[in-house]
Amino acid sequence: MAPPAKRAKRGWVPPGYKYLGPGNSLDQGEPTNPSDAAAKEHDEAYDQYIKSGKNPYLYFSAADQRFIDQTKDAKDWGGKVGHYFFRTKRAFAPKLATDSEPGTSGVSRAGKRTRPPAYIFINQARAKKKLTSSAAQQSSQTMSDGTSQPDGGNAVHSAARVERAADGPGGSGGGGSGGGGVGVSTGSYDNQTHYRFLGDGWVEITALATRLVHLNMPKSENYCRIRVHNTTDTSVKGNMAKDDAHEQIWTPWSLVDANAWGVWLQPSDWQYICNTMSQLNLVSLDQEIFNVVLKTVTEQDSGGQAIKIYNNDLTACMMVAVDSNNILPYTPAANSMETLGFYPWKPTIASPYRYYFCVDRDLSVTYENQEGTIEHNVMGTPKGMNSQFFTIENTQQITLLRTGDEFATGTYYFDTNPVKLTHTWQTNRQLGQPPLLSTFPEADTDAGTLTAQGSRHGATQMEVNWVSEAIRTRPAQVGFCQPHNDFEASRAGPFAAPKVPADVTQGVDREANGSVRYSYGKQHGENWAAHGPAPERYTWDETNFGSGRDTRDGFIQSAPLVVPPPLNGILTNANPIGTKNDIHFSNVFNSYGPLTAFSHPSPVYPQGQIWDKELDLEHKPRLHITAPFVCKNNAPGQMLVRLGPNLTDQYDPNGATLSRIVTYGTFFWKGKLTMRAKLRANTTWNPVYQVSVEDNGNSYMSVTKWLPTATGNMQSVPLITRPVARNTY
């Protein structure tokens, strides 16, 4: 008779776990959850330490740090307890020696056993002191209306990163920064998208993005107030739409902007999300900077024999600030196509940070073939009551990074409303119960008939005895007509009034109401081989009959606005409608009211903006045209970077120019955007239309557009968002 099988050694394990706890065997079967899996990996590492003659229980090891990293987002109580246990161990226990780095444990295979350098303890103390000070300061800093930033700023949430930096060589500590030291990698390059199915049809989507960002010295170290007044264009009658007059504050900082769908998701991800999900919402955002490299450029000899020499500068610094409390003007870069770009393998640049400054603008409204002269084409001067000049140095806490350092913003949590990823086909005429048929067709080509007029039953909103589909009472209005292609006057000059893409009129009479024109370049999806210096352009015509059903009907290359406009296309307060021809009711009629229902603007992949800041006014708009998600209270803080002034010995504070060492830098930006989606239930008998590519090389959805050419040319045209129809009533 065979001896009974030995029961596996099982130490103290909390309920629901197999490996989380001391004294366990390594053959307990499959882990029960991610925290238990991290504990199993941790136990296996401890086993290897013991076999090599080291005691991991009395010393803090790399396995302990790995367990901390793997459980930092743990949702289960056991993972949280284990996470903080080993963080406490890290604070008090000496470090275990490795083959490449001597520590304070008893065994070291190579090299002389030495004490840790004194600066490590000094940096630890500085990091903890500055962390406490920054956290206290951040918790007390609020917006002008008393609303705090949801993420708590970069100081509080980057505590783990600061502690890790203080442990490593060259730790800089403080704020949201850390140090890995020269030649030490401080991050990973990751552009994957992960889908975690949570049950009940919910899916957590984690989009990771990484970019190599190039940063040059600013053109000037000063803030500049610059005026643009293109009188050459606007002095020509009919060119009001070409008016560019404004003043802006140009800053020496650059904006690291990831607020575009193409930064986070590859085309196949967008296809999968839109084909299988019914709604989408934002959850959280994390950003970090690592592997900072700063270099100086010097020239030897001159003329045609000049040779440029590039050297690492270990003393130069890069400055980083995050506007967590939204103090500075909000300037999303997607509308100017200046985000981080849509191709992870291509280096990119940050967008120069600039913002509008208040100045009055007076321009006469003109039209084509107008007689007479233009009376007004002037700009005003700054006014004391409206002038707001912001500087980053006076409004933000700035972190200084050197070569090898890193920085993290912490986690921002969104408070937004979900957006549907299906389109509606029902207009007012399709709400409710169809009329009762009196006769049925006898053949497939025949039509049915209704009861004769005068004998029908039903509710109408007309004082006649008719009951027809045109006048039946409906519960609400789906979509609405609104004035469009109109220019409104403002103190800063004329502007095209924003339009909601909710028009439901038929055929060409709708005049592309609510359409948005996208012009973009090589980093954002342009077919540069075909277009050359001119940008590629598409119009997102969301209200086209085929929009959401057929991509080529949604994205067109024709422009909806004619410049200069004809007389009959312009309405001003001096022109009564009755004196003009070809003015349709849709140019002036507004059917928006308390009974109006309409769809939210669609996300536009890849060029569209993702989130937007809520306007700080007592009465908020129901939506924004620029982005599908509007952040309640604060939006994610804008990340700003610049190279610190690298001066020469010729610096003169009274001089007209700065004598600077030519310096540039590169760094890796990495982000994590977490979203939550709902799986779409299959309800129809018939197959549904979905986003799909075609073999035809001339079609809009030809697969060749998303494939590289022999010279590496890539194209990424806009993709639809709402391919599948849904019932709304």
UniProtKB/Swiss-Prot annotation:
InterPro entries, sorted: Capsid/spike_ssDNA_virus, Parvovirus_coat, Phospholipase_A2-like, VP1/VP2
Polar residues composition-biased segments: 25-35
Role: Capsid protein self-assembles to form an icosahedral capsid with a T=1 symmetry, about 22 nm in diameter, and consisting of 60 copies of two size variants of the capsid proteins, VP1 and VP2, which differ by the presence of an N-terminal extension in the minor protein VP1. The capsid encapsulates the genomic ssDNA. Capsid proteins are responsible for the attachment to host cell receptors. This attachment induces virion internalization predominantly through clathrin-dependent endocytosis.
Additional record remark: The capsids of autonomous parvoviruses expose a proportion of VP2 N-terminus and part of that sequence can be cleaved of to form VP3.
GO cellular component, one term: host cell
Entry comment, domain topic: The N-terminus of VP1 is sequestered within the mature capsid. It contains a phospholipase A2-like region and putative nuclear localization signals.
Keyword annotations: Capsid protein, Clathrin-mediated endocytosis of virus by host, Cytoplasmic inwards viral transport, Host nucleus, Host-virus interaction, Magnesium, Metal-binding, Microtubular inwards viral transport, T=1 icosahedral capsid protein, Viral attachment to host cell, Viral penetration into host cytoplasm, Viral penetration into host nucleus, Viral penetration via permeabilization of host membrane, Virion, Virus endocytosis by host, Virus entry into host cell
Motif Nuclear localization signal, residue numbers: 4-13
Region (Phospholipase A2-like) residue spans: 19-64
Basic residues: compositionally biased ranges: 1-10
A single GO molecular function term of this UniProt record: structural molecule activity
UniProt binding sites for Mg(2+): 325
UniProt family annotation: Belongs to the parvoviridae capsid protein family.
Protein name according to UniProt: Capsid protein VP1
Bias type Gly residues, positions: 168-184
GO biological process entries: clathrin-dependent endocytosis of virus by host cell; microtubule-dependent intracellular transport of viral material towards nucleus; symbiont entry into host cell via permeabilization of host membrane; viral penetration into host nucleus; virion attachment to host cell
Region (Disordered): 1-39, 96-115, 130-185
Gene3D superfamilies to which the protein is assigned, alphabetical: Parvovirus coat protein VP1/VP2 (2.170.30.10)
Cellular compartments annotated: Virion; Host nucleus
Low complexity biased stretches: 132-142
